[in-house]
Every structure is written in C-alpha cells, then in structure tokens.
C-alpha cells in the first residue's frame, strides 16, 4: 500500500455545499490528475455508473455516484464511450444484497476493494452496518468526498490482509461483496479468500462477479483497449457457472448459485441478456454474478 498526502491548495477549490441523506462535508472538488495510488479502474467504474444514473431512462438510481463523479475533476472522456454494463453489474449486486438484507436487516455488509462505489446509499435500510475495505489512498478519498454515517466504517487494508475480518460484527449476519475485484487477483488468492470467509462467517453470504475465460485470456495477451488512451488492466482470474463445483468443494460452503440477469436498458440488450442466461450451453460465455452461502 502506498500512502499519499492530502491534496494541496492547488488541487481543490470550494464550491457550494449540497445536501444528502447523510452528513456531508463542505463541498470540495479534487483534481483527479494528482491522485496517487488511486486505481483508474475506480474512476472508470464511477464514471460509467454515474453516467447511467444521470440518464432519464437509466437502469440505476445513484445520485451519490453523480455527486462523487462531479467532485473529482478528471478527463473522463479518456476512458472512451460509456455503456450500461457497470451499472448493470451494480444493479445485480443490489438485488443479491437486498435478498440477504430482507432476512437479516441488521447484518454487517463488508465491501471488499470498494473503490469509489456508492452501494451503501442505495442499500441503506437504516439498520445495517457497513465496512468499506480498500487501500489507504481510496479510503482517504472516500472520507474526503462522501457523506458520513455512524453505521459506515472504513478499513485501510488490502482485501487479502485478512485482519479486516477482526472488525466484522457477525452477530446479525454478514454479507461480503467483491464487486469488480476477483478478476484482477490470482486464482489461488481468490479461492483462499473465499475459504477464509466461509470459515469465519458461518451463516453469511458472499457475492462476487467474474469474467469468462475468453475475456481473461484476451486481456492478458492483447490487452482490453477501451479507448486510444486507456487499456484495462489484465484479468488473470476467470470463472463461470461451469466451475461452481470448485466452490462447493470448499469446507464451509453450503450452496452456490448464479444470480439471474437483472433488467437492462433497451429491447435488444434485454433480449440478448435473457437469451444468454436461458441457454445452459452459453454459461461459459457469461460474466456471472455468483452468490455463495456459508454453512
């Protein structure tokens, strides 16, 4: 983990404050060009989600994402064209999370490598507790720019530093989310982390997404170029529903299933997604959102 200094006077400017459901610090705009240790993928996914949320026909309601994006002065066009895929993934995580929170409303949600996600404000039921785990630069940025809550804590550690588990109150249930994380890890690290969660959080759940084999291989061999200026990082871990037996073999895992496709925007996209999820022979081509239940 690399530490960064707080932005200097030349990196921020005061603008009028805005009101949110939670307490908000005075409105600042930070210069994203000077961030050190903040992954560009965090800015990319924020931009994609906020752009979708700002559409009149957007598939996700995320005003905090729009606010956060606007508080970071950055050339988002650097990432190329926007699309709904990132918001579609977030919508799937919201659906899976709400299913668990409907039964365990006071559960602790642990968001691993949360980046600049804003899931807490979309899911907050007034009772849950939230632990945001990420490296120090991201944690500092979140604390500077996002609303606060007495039920929202941060932990400046890697998801692979299992000491974050000591901060989790499991009395009312635990939901661990890994949104946009596992594909950037080595396979052994992913399975070790899942096994550690299963051992530690009996009765809890894990939700994660992954990419299919062809996309992983392409990203490593040729690079996934999203624009002339930006190429996505390599994704060494791939995983589809065809590999679920590997998870079922881990001690402490009760059940594994794939989240059905959430609704997308547009007739063509919606029809293609339904077809992709309806045909078993296409399971190896999907980028699934997987739910793991711990015994």
Identify the function of each model-found stretch.
Residues 184-196:
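A short, conserved alpha-helix within the catalytic core of class I
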Residues 176-177:
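A conserved beta-strand element that flanks and buttresses the S-adenosyl-L-methionine
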Residues 2, 13-110, 114-157, 170:
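Rossmann-like AdoMet
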Residues 235-260:
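Short alpha-helix
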Residues 217-234:
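Short, glycine-/aromatic-enriched active-site segment of Class I SAM-dependent methyltransferases
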Residues 251-278:
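Conserved catalytic loop of SAM-dependent methyltransferase domains
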Residues 200-213:
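Conserved beta-strand signature within the Rossmann-like core of class I S-adenosyl-L-methionine
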Residues 162-171:
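Short amphipathic alpha-helix with an adjacent loop that forms part of the alpha/beta core around
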């Amino acid at each position: 983990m690399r530490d960064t200094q707080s932005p200097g006077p030349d990196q921020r400017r005061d603008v009028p404050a805005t009101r949110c459901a939670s307490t908000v610090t005075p409105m600042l705009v930070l210069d994203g060009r000077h961030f050190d240790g903040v992954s560009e993928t965090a800015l990319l996914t924020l931009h994609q989600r906020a752009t979708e949320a700002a559409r009149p026909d957007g598939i996700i309601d995320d005003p905090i994402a729009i606010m956060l994006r606007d508080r970071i002065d950055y050339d988002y066009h650097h990432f190329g064209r926007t699309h709904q895929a990132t918001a579609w993934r977030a919508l799937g995580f919201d659906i899976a999370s709400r299913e668990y929170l409907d039964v365990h409303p006071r559960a602790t949600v642990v968001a691993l490598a949360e980046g600049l996600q804003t899931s807490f404000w979309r899911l907050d039921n007034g009772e849950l507790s939230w632990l945001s785990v990420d490296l120090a630069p991201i944690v500092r940025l979140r604390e500077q720019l996002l609303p606060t809550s007495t039920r929202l804590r941060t932990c400046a550690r890697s998801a692979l530093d299992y000491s974050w588990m000591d901060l989790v109150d499991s009395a009312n249930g635990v939901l661990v989310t890994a949104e946009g994380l596992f594909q950037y890890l080595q396979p052994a690290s992913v399975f070790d982390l899942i096994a550690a969660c299963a051992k530690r959080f009996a009765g809890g759940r894990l939700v994660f997404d992954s990419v299919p084999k062809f996309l992983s291989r392409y990203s490593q061999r040729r690079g996934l170029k999203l624009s002339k200026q930006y190429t996505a990082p390599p994704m060494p871990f791939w995983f589809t529903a065809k590999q679920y037996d590997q998870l079922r073999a881990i001690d402490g895992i009760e059940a594994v299933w794939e989240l059905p496709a959430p609704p997308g925007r547009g007739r063509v996209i919606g029809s293609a997604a339904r077809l992709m999820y309806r045909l078993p022979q296409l399971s190896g081509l999907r980028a699934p959102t997987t739910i793991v239940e711990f015994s």
